[in-house]
Amino acid sequence: MISKYGTIGILGGMGPEATANAYHEIIDSTPVTKDQEHIPVIIYSNPQIPDRTDGILYGGESPLPELLVTTKKLEYSGADFVIIPCNTSHFFIKELRASVNIPVISMIEETLAFVKEKYPYITKVGLLATTGTIKTGIYNNIFSSANMDILSPECGEQESLVMESIYGE
């Protein structure tokens, strides 16, 4: 049986737990009565992708080359579209989309669509994310197009509470 959804490609490895969680969410959200009804998924968990926050904000090694290679490998492997379970990597989504002939789904755009559909009167949305995600403004850029403001923690709370909980530091 061919899935009506096609084959999902997961651009993973940033961190591996986020990749595993995305896969589990796909499994748990798919109504099936037998194994053969699940959606085909190709996972490329690439631990060689440099730290996104370091590369974007602090002059570290750019993650873009490895993100491009990984996206292309998913396409060549038969993925019909790609998802990226890493917010900060969406900073490079235009380049990733331009590098392949299959859709690269933006979870930020999908989040906006969800909020607009479920909560059409909301004008402010809270964001807990890495410092890289917040400082790049990738959520602000997308949500401002819908006249929504993004609220995030103050710098001190961001580093001491949010980053600590994400990275376990």
Predicted stretch roles:
Residues 1-169:
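Non-catalytic structural scaffold of enzyme domains
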